[in-house]
Amino acid sequence: MTQLETRTEPMIINFGPHHPSMHGVLRLVVTLDGEDVVDCEPVIGYLHRGMEKIAESRTAITFVPYVSRWDYAAGMFNEAITVNATEKLMDLEIPRRASYIRVLMLELNRIANHLLWLGPFLADVGAQTPFFYIFREREMIYDLWEAVTGQRLINNNYFRVGGVACDLPFGWLDKCEDFCDWFGPKIDEYEQLITNNPIFRRRIEGLGVISREQAINWSLSGPMLRASGVPWDLRKVDHYECYDDFDWDIAWAKEGDCYARYLVRIEEMRQSLRILKQALKMIPGGPTENLEAQCGFDSTDTNQDLDKKRSVATGEVSGNEYTIGPKKINLNKCPEGELYCRVESGKGELGVFIISNGEANPWRWKIRAADFNNLQILPHILTGAKVADVMAILGSIDVIMGSVDR
């Protein structure tokens, strides 16, 4: 008996740009052969707002309020790279206390970023309960931000060229320490619910595998790179801010699949807690609301009086632990030159390339968004996957379209 050969025509379907699993206004044009993905074309640009051109018409200080809208889940990192790049171009050293405060904000933002990734990712693969748990912890982080900056999610506008906008309020360090003590067991709770859940593991293990060579060749960064066997973290590599003062480990894995990327982000939250706890104990000046009032600063003090009062307050004889009157800089005239500056955000390497011609505004301001680069590998790892796995693989990348489109 002869068998009839059946052939199926390729089917082209659109995911997004308004699908709830798209994590923003992302459109995927997917070509299917039955249930197998043959090709995928990401269509971006729906959220483009010309952030680079806006930066070229603003000074460094006046541009800081805009940057929270790149990656609106990690606004502190956007502010950090904006001021760090300007400080590096100006050869400006910031007070030690300000650097510690920045680290506190950045690590809180890293935890908030991973929590916001974890909940929707699990919802994408069918686990609804943890989606509601993560908002409980994120609200506590927002409370801490609100106490310092007055804002919760975005528009913190807290980082400044040369330091931060204001000192920590009275009692904030104690509240942050309470959060660290409370959040540690919650990570264990997540792992009990998720990590060894057989349904969850069978759903994502082996999906979206990226080898070590592929991760390097595609210029991946962050958890996407570290989950593929490359222990690369800019906090260790570039030694920016005061990360060298703390004892912590790089979270990485070798498998390169969706499950490995999940494990890396869970471990990164633990390491962020380690950094936070150490920074809370080691911060110069201690838990104070007003350093000037605590040290008895007066406008008639001489330089010797100022140095003596600073040494009394910090317990140090010398050193730039904190500075009430920092080095005077002309923010209306940025030094001529060009440089590339980068920080390790929750999604990977967030960089800025600046070209300055000596005027107040930069001549060129190029943003290197981590999730924009990470998204480029999506068609490669989707080819050959099932249509039901598209959302799981996309979710493991962790993209925010405000950052991708800029």
Swiss-Prot record:
Location, primary (coarse class): plastid
Gene Ontology terms for molecular function: NAD binding; NADH:ubiquinone reductase (non-electrogenic) activity; quinone binding
Subcellular location per the Swiss-Prot or TrEMBL entry: Plastid, Organellar chromatophore thylakoid membrane
Signal peptide region: none
Keyword field: Membrane, NAD, NADP, Organellar chromatophore, Plastid, Plastoquinone, Quinone, Thylakoid, Translocase, Transport
SUPFAM superfamilies: HydB/Nqo4-like
Superkingdom: Eukaryota
Membrane topology summary: Peripheral membrane protein
Pfam families linked to this entry: Complex1_49kDa
EC number: 7.1.1.-
Recorded catalytic activity of this chain's protein: a quinone + NADH + H(+) = a quinol + NAD(+)
EC primary class: translocase
Gene Ontology CC annotations of this record: organellar chromatophore thylakoid membrane; plasma membrane; plastid
InterPro entries in alphabetical order: NADH_Q_OxRdtase_suD, NADH_UbQ_OxRdtase_49kDa_CS, NDH1_su_D/H, NiFe-Hase_large
Family, as annotated: Belongs to the complex I 49 kDa subunit family.
Subunit comment: NDH is composed of at least 16 different subunits, 5 of which are encoded in the nucleus.
HAMAP family attached to this UniProt entry: NDH1_NuoD
The protein's role, per its UniProt record: NDH shuttles electrons from NAD(P)H:plastoquinone, via FMN and iron-sulfur (Fe-S) centers, to quinones in the photosynthetic chain and possibly in a chloroplast respiratory chain. The immediate electron acceptor for the enzyme in this species is believed to be plastoquinone. Couples the redox reaction to proton translocation, and thus conserves the redox energy in a proton gradient.
Name of this chain's protein: NAD(P)H-quinone oxidoreductase subunit H, organellar chromatophore
Species this chain originates from: Paulinella chromatophora
